[in-house]
From Swiss-Prot:
InterPro entries: Ribosomal_uS2 (IPR001865), Ribosomal_uS2_bac/mit/plastid (IPR005706), Ribosomal_uS2_CS (IPR018130), Ribosomal_uS2_flav_dom_sf (IPR023591). It comes from Bartonella quintana (strain Toulouse). GO terms for molecular function: structural constituent of ribosome. GO terms for biological process: translation. Keywords: Ribonucleoprotein, Ribosomal protein. Pfam families: Ribosomal_S2 (PF00318). Belongs to the universal ribosomal protein uS2 family. The keyword Transcription regulation does not apply. This is Small ribosomal subunit protein uS2. One of its GO terms (cellular component) is cytosolic small ribosomal subunit.
Length: 257
């Protein structure tokens, strides 16, 4: 395998360059903004490309050393994509609600995970001794725990690196990571504060196509790390064809500092 490749055309096709309306911006993002068009900020993809590449390499290197990556994205349009990317790259995820203390109070979280495992075992092997109502209550408890913790059930400890979609929504996760010294890679839209994360990647954090592209790239980077760790360099994940796109940045008004 090799580190996943991508092109400027893919970023444009996915709408990575589209930020928020100009009145909904964070001034700290000025250095990553190319200009504005129809009152929408346009993100400077010339900066996104190298930062994304560096982040992908960091993910691959971390996994190659045996590290764990936690994918975090709880917004509606990111939830399923985040889970799929983590599952197919043998990593971990939080895609429902971030529970306070998920990192900083790992002992309590571990107890809840133990409860989830116990419920899995009970419902798989010991169903005869329960009434229909008791079984239904157990299933509801398991469903609730699995929704919150299913993606980190097998993580074993806090992650070595975190990848986040939407830093505004996942602010608590970022704060907890900072307290523990866990590096954070994050997609930062034009309404975000890039200073809050260790490895910011300027880009649209709302469009499903953009989120799918990011998650696919990071999943493949993790798989590359696994392949490097195991010495199995012959895995073929397939190549993504580049779709032609029309020039989109024409008539864009530059933004000056």
């Amino acid at each position: 395998m090799a580190l996943p490749d991508f092109t400027m055309h893919q970023l444009l096709e996915a709408g990575v360059h589209f930020g928020h309306q100009t009145h909904r911006w964070n001034p700290k993002m000025i250095r990553y903004i190319y200009g504005q068009r129809n009152n929408i900020h346009i993100i400077d993809l010339a900066q996104t490309v190298p930062l994304l590449h560096q982040a992908l390499k960091l993910v691959s290197d971390t996994v190659a050393r045996g590290g764990r990556i936690l994918f975090v994205g709880t917004k509606r349009q990111a939830s399923d994509i985040i889970a799929d990317a983590a599952n197919r790259s043998a990593q971990y995820y939080v895609n429902a609600r971030w529970l306070g203390g998920m990192l900083t109070n790992w002992k309590t979280i571990s107890n809840s995970i133990h409860r989830l495992r116990k419920l899995d075992k009970i419902l798989a092997t010991e169903t005869q001794g329960f009434t229909k109502k008791e079984r239904l209550n157990l299933e509801r408890d398991r469903e609730k725990l699995n929704r919150a913790l299913g993606g980190i059930k097998d993580m074993g400890s806090v992650p070595d690196l975190i990848f986040i979609i939407d830093t505004n929504k996942e602010n608590i996760a970022i704060q907890e990571a900072k307290r523990l010294g866990i590096p954070v890679i994050a997609i930062i839209d034009t309404n975000c504060n890039p200073d809050n994360v260790d490895h910011p990647i300027p880009g649209n954090d709302d469009a499903s196509r953009a989120i799918s592209l990011y998650c696919d790239l990071f999943a493949r980077a993790a798989l590359d790390g696994i392949a490097r760790q195991q010495g199995a360099m012959g895995i073929d994940l397939g190549a993504q064809a580049d779709a032609p796109v029309k020039p989109i940045l024409e008539n864009t008004i530059p933004v000056s500092e």
